[in-house]
A protein has these predicted regions:
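Active-site rim/loop-helix segments in enzyme catalytic domains that contact anionic ligands
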Residues: 1-120
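Extended, charged catalytic domains and RNA/DNA-binding interfaces, predominantly
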Residues: 119, 123-131
Length: 131
């Protein structure tokens, strides 16, 4: 068993699969503790109502899909940063009082949350995508 740690920092559920799912799975399978920090729950996506499969919202569906993907990819943990998705145009508004929109959040605030996870996990490798 390896004592190495990898951290993926991504914006939405499904970024882990579309972006570099095979890489995450490869390292997890080799014994690396692979963790994911996800900025949003993907609430601004679209899905036909009949495809919600009993989930109360798109965010709930997307988070459930992420949980399934995390299991298949053998991720050690998945953490939500506490932001709402803004949508593809980045104009998702101010968010709710409980959950601000990631695209509108102060850079210093988002950075501090990510740095907290980096310090907690102390990964040797961090993967992310461009803004």
């Amino acid at each position: 068993m390896s004592n190495h740690t990898m951290l993926a920092v991504l914006a939405h559920p499904d970024d882990e699969s579309f972006g570099f799912g095979a890489t995450l799975a490869l390292y997890a399978d080799s014994g690396v503790a692979v963790h994911l920090v996800c900025g949003t729950r993907g609430e601004a996506g679209t899905v036909r109502p009949e495809l919600l499969n009993g989930h109360a919202s798109i965010g709930d569906l997307r988070w459930a899909e992420l949980a399934c993907a995390a299991e298949q990819l053998q991720l050690a943990s998945v953490t939500h940063l506490g932001y709402r998705d803004s949508g593809i145009d980045g104009k998702g508004g101010e968010g709710t009082g409980e959950m601000p929109v990631l695209a509108a959040a102060p850079l210093e605030e988002v950075t501090a949350k990510i740095v907290w996870h980096i310090r907690r996990l102390q990964p040797q490798v961090i993967l992310t995508h461009d803004p």
